[in-house]
């Protein structure tokens, strides 16, 4: 029988960081609150073990995520933001740069860096994903961080 290794939704220990994009702050603040709540519900004392770093926008997320993950101070880093489609191709560029950069930060450092950036066609969709009809994607990102950090710990033991 094959051995199964998976992360758990229990406190893996260590510190966590949220890197939040200030652009569309009225949405992102809800994502940050949802993430904080999810971490607390899973045993992380966010008063002492969570740092929240604000950057101007989604394009700036990867650089700070990379820096925090490479510092060795964090068990997981969570990137949160909201990119809402406009009438130009700028949306596609921002989404692509942010997603690839966050993935690269995780791969390059070996630290879970979770992509919790909303990429929506409308403000209404963003609001739905920030805590109304579609749940809170910030909370989902927080859970992914806990599970991935737990999985990394399991793989190292």
Feature names for model-found ranges:
Residues 4-56:
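Glycine-rich phosphate/diphosphate-binding loop of Rossmann-like nucleotide-binding domains
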Residues 9, 24, 28, 58-61, ...:
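Generic structural signal for well-ordered, non-membrane alpha-helical segments
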Residues 29, 33, 62-66, 70, ...:
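Amphipathic, non-transmembrane alpha-helical secondary structure
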Residues 60-102, 157:
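Glycine-rich phosphate-binding loop
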